[in-house]
């Protein structure tokens, strides 16, 4: 019985010490205290470039969501048509916003360069800018499959 009572006494003392210790410790604040305005480097608007001049970056990113089927077919089947809206979004993100964002969408840097190169090649307003594909340091390794499309409808005989 003596060992049981000494165990309980030790347990109570340790518990009491932990409670006292935890009451004297202060936790760090979850957010930095702000003095009127937040610093430019910690501001969410600054980090996401959400000022009035870069709203088109987010619009372009949303546009890429709508043309993801075209981009997948471009690489998967070798279908060589990407619409002008999709190309505009690719150029905007690659040149004016976040060049690495195309990689975040699941494409490699080489595939992003290929998309930009394709869109630059079809851009009539290129203004003499270098093509992203031509300036890429990565070797091309995408082999497109040739597909034959056959019409299943037979011509009608009068």
From Swiss-Prot:
Found, by tissue, as follows: Restricted to female reproductive tissues, specifically accumulating in storage vesicles of the unfertilized egg cell.
Q: Does the keyword Thylakoid apply?
A: no
Where are the bilayer-spanning segments?
none
Compartments where found: Cytoplasmic vesicle; Secreted
Provide a GO biological process annotation: sperm capacitation
Its Gene Ontology cellular component terms are: cytoplasmic vesicle; extracellular region; vesicle
- Annotated signal sequence is 1-27
Answer yes or no on keyword Phosphoprotein. no
* Protein keywords: Cytoplasmic vesicle, Fertilization, Glycoprotein, Secreted, Signal
Q: Which residues are glycosylated?
A: 122
Per the record, the similarity remark reads: Belongs to the plant egg cell-secreted peptide family.
Give the protein's function: Involved in the regulation of gamete interactions during the double fertilization and to prevent multiple-pollen tube attraction; mediates the redistribution of the gamete fusogen HAP2/GCS1 to the cell surface after secretion upon sperm arrival.
This one is known as Egg cell-secreted protein 1.1
The record's gene field reads EC1.1
């Amino acid at each position: 019985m003596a060992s049981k009572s000494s165990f309980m006494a030790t347990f109570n003392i340790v518990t009491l010490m932990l409670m006292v210790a935890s009451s004297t410790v202060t936790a760090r604040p979850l957010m930095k205290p702000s003095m009127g305005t937040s610093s430019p480097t910690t501001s969410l608007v600054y980090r996401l470039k959400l000022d009035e001049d870069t709203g088109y970056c987010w619009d372009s990113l949303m546009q890429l969501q709508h043309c993801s089927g075209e981009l997948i077919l471009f690489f998967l089947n070798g279908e060589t048509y990407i619409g002008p809206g999709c190309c505009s979004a690719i150029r905007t993100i690659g040149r004016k916003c976040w060049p690495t964002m195309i990689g975040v969408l699941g494409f490699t840097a080489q595939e992003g360069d290929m998309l930009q190169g394709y869109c630059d090649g079809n851009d009539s307003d290129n203004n003499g800018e270098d093509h992203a594909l031509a300036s890429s340091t990565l070797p091309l390794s995408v082999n497109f499959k040739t597909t034959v499309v056959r019409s299943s409808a037979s011509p009608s005989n009068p």
